[in-house]
Amino acid sequence: MHQNIELAGWFCTLIMMASTSWSADGGAVPKSAAGVSSDSTTQAEVKAAFARFIAGQNAHDASIVSDVLVNSKGFVWAQYGGNSIWGFDEAMAAFKTAWKGSWHLDPQLNELRITRVAPSVAVLITPQLYTDGDPGEPPSTVPVRWGGVFVKTAAGWRISSLFITPYPDWGKH
């Protein structure tokens, strides 16, 4: 339990760091709501970016995936096994390697949640069934909790960070 609380605190710290470092206004709270999209608009736009990411992943299409990620050395992919890959180029190389085997993401959209943590930052969390396997080996499927930090850029919503954690109790509630 203590470990879960510690991890939750770490995750919140990262989100708050992202909200001030990735937002175009340095994290400042706007003086008025003008120019800030509504929660329903934000949710629709973030869901659309997430759908493009999933489609690109399942098609093993680097051009689609790269278009929805923030192209930065600060991009991080915290993987299921505990490793972290830092940097856009490094993450894209890791995806391309993983795609040589079995690789499929099946988001469970009935539990998808999105929250805005700043005017230009949103977090999407959803369970997924993650299937992977080395080339020539039978694939395995495990339930994971997928989390992404999305930032609003001039080109639209992009993913700045991915967090994949085990979700052994998925489907038990």
Name each model-derived stretch:
Residues 9-19:
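Bacterial N-terminal signal peptides
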